[in-house]
């Protein structure tokens, strides 16, 4: 049996593609999902909390548009996914592309994708 340190070291040496496959295998084996939990917020207290600016944004690929190949290339560049994974993501829109990113990064990603004809939502 491997120690926690050995497991961490093995994960540190994996490629992005290998890590993606590992996550999928863990999801299937244990019946869980690696998606970030969604917090349901209650009503804002006297509107004070609603005025606070959101600091983390999710970038959602809503539609790939007519130039799917260009969109797949940009998705690969942004996410580091392999060709098959990027194609699957683009073919099955709407899908989250990046989660919990800064406003600047979200706007940059949105601009890159819209430049090649994709429809993108920032939430």
Swiss-Prot record:
One of its GO terms (molecular function) is structural constituent of ribosome. This is Large ribosomal subunit protein bL12. GO terms for biological process: translation. The gene is rplL. Forms part of the ribosomal stalk which helps the ribosome interact with GTP-bound translation factors. Is thus essential for accurate translation. SUPFAM superfamilies: ClpS-like (SSF54736), Ribosomal protein L7/12, oligomerisation (N-terminal) domain (SSF48300). Belongs to the bacterial ribosomal protein bL12 family. PANTHER family: 39S RIBOSOMAL PROTEIN L12, LARGE RIBOSOMAL SUBUNIT PROTEIN BL12M. InterPro entries: Ribosomal_bL12, Ribosomal_bL12_C, Ribosomal_bL12_C/ClpS-like, Ribosomal_bL12_oligo, Ribosomal_bL12_oligo_N_sf. Homodimer. Part of the ribosomal stalk of the 50S ribosomal subunit. Forms a multimeric L10(L12)X complex, where L10 forms an elongated spine to which 2 to 4 L12 dimers bind in a sequential fashion. Binds GTP-bound translation factors. GO terms for cellular component: cytosolic large ribosomal subunit. Keywords: Ribonucleoprotein, Ribosomal protein. It comes from Geobacillus thermodenitrificans (strain NG80-2).
